Amino acid sequence: MYPRVMHAVCFLALGLISYVAVCAENTVTTNCLVKAENTHLTCKCNPNTTSNTNNGSKCHAMCKCRVTEPITMLGAYSAWGAGSFVATLIVLLVVFFVIYAREEEKNNTGTEVDQCLAYRSLTRKKLEQHAAKKQNIYERIPYRPSRQNDNSPLIEPTGTDDEEDEDDDV
């Protein structure tokens, strides 16, 4: 797998887990009489809060309502709905791709690639290749150190040399 795809999957999984942990748990301020099929109420008594009681001996229960099936049909039948689930996934994807869009391109060694240096290196290679071709052409020409008394032409035309010169021009 590509590293970015793996990072995206992990990012979305962590985001979804944190969303379920935070948003699927709502505080209910009743005395735990409201209970649905797909919820689980955990209640604890807060002795400092004595509201809604006849005498001071009973306390008002602080209940937390946790949804037990948050991912059923993308949350359509759960307490927090499909709309917030899809919106959260969209926000997570946008944040993820904005983070990766700002990342600089890196080569295999892990160092940043400078576009100007890469262009210069490519140009230098092309010039060296061109010079090597020219050098090959000049190596075929015989070198004559003293031409003062020599009236013969530098290159003597032969049938095979002309054919090779035509190939070099292409």
UniProtKB/Swiss-Prot annotation:
Residues passing through the membrane, by range: 79-99
Topology versus the membrane: Single-pass membrane protein
Gene: RL10
GO cellular component: plasma membrane; viral envelope; virion membrane
Name this polypeptide is given: Protein IRL10
Pfam families, per database record: Cytomega_TRL10
Biased composition range(s): Acidic residues: 159-170
InterPro entries tied to this protein: Cytomega_TRL10 (IPR009284)
Originating species: Human cytomegalovirus (strain Merlin)
Compartmental location: Virion membrane
Upper taxonomic lineage: Viruses, Duplodnaviria, Heunggongvirae, Peploviricota, Herviviricetes
Region annotation (Disordered) ranges: 132-170
Membership in a protein family: Belongs to the HHV-5 RL10 protein family.
Keywords: Glycoprotein, Membrane, Signal, Transmembrane, Transmembrane helix, Virion
Signal peptide: 1-24
Primary site of residence: virion
Glycosylation site positions: 48, 55, 107
